[in-house]
Amino acid sequence: MRQVTRIVALALFLLCVSGFTECYKPVTKTQLPKHIKTVAVPAFQNNALRFKIEHRFTEAVMNELIRRGHGLRVQSEREGADAVIDGVVKSFNFSGVLLDDKGRARIFEVTIVAAVTVRDQHENRVLYDNQNFVFRGEFEFANDPRNFFNEEDPAVQRMSRSFAESIVSTLVNGFGVKDDK
């Protein structure tokens, strides 16, 4: 009886393993080609007409690449780079989402839309393109004017770090699903 149970369990296991090999595609470990050792991050363009926002996003992407780029060299010039990360901050909006008892906006939501393209310089092809990165964050104004502290700048800093983490994760962990097995 015990041997029959083992044989049935083994047959069931083999059936499951062999029968479902086409039901998934493995996620890539990295889509970054092996020859890419240096990544250029030129200053992002600012179409949002918001002071220094492009600088914050560019700096955040460079810092995140240095921190998590697995030995990638990071530079700001395109010359000599194996890949280039181009970015455009398309829009910056904030709106009140919570009012105080006097009808004044107390908590604001910031929405930033950006476009990012990663290009292989050697093969002259686009590795990644997302023209609609959307990031949201919020900041709060204090009720008491003596404790007033504008949280808009820290909120933008947090969003730029989140943006950079997303971009670098995409580069380091892969762009999607492999077509071949």
Protein language model regions, located:
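A short beta-turn/loop motif at secondary-structure boundaries
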Residues: P33, E77-A81
